[in-house]
Amino acid sequence: MRTDMLRELERIVRLAGDMVREAHDIEQVTTEKTGAADLVTKYDVAVQGFLKRELLTLLPEADFFGEEGEHAALTRPWTFIVDPIDGTTNFVRRLHYSNISVALAHDGQVAYAVVYDPFADQLFSAQKDCGAFCNGLPIHVSDKDMAHAVFLCGSTIYDRSLTEQNFSLLRQLYDRGLDSRRF
């Protein structure tokens, strides 16, 4: 069952998705944060600013922790955790594999989460102890046997010290599953 808080988070994140979908001049406004693989655009900053305003209007007593340099002290019971454009490298190259990620944690535990792909109009949301949803419909973990499963994985591009561990885990999944995909 989705509560009013989850519905409000979904609404706000969809509005942020409109900003991402309507972006232009992306290539001309890109800068590096910590290296060539860690990019930020004016849209990352604008979407994060929008989300901060809207989310703190929704829950003013919360802290805000944003990927683009907005790291609160995290001393309050409620904290918003935001990645305004998760997949900026794809976004800059106009590959439509980016999303907006927002979580609301209470006392260090995620209570609500919303991940929205504005290009596919897929909104995933979850509420602690209430299940997960895709575009409002309940979803669940697959019950397929691992031998018949296809795995999707990411990597640790920002911390190369974890590369060996990452690929070791991927190898274990690959050996036990049907196939793997990396996006």
PLM segments and residue spans:
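N-terminal subdomain of lithium-sensitive/metallo-dependent phosphomonoesterases centered on the IMPase/IPPase/PAP
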Residues: 1-85
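An extended, acidic
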Residues: 141-183
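Short, isolated positions in well-ordered beta-strands
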Residues: 111, 139-141
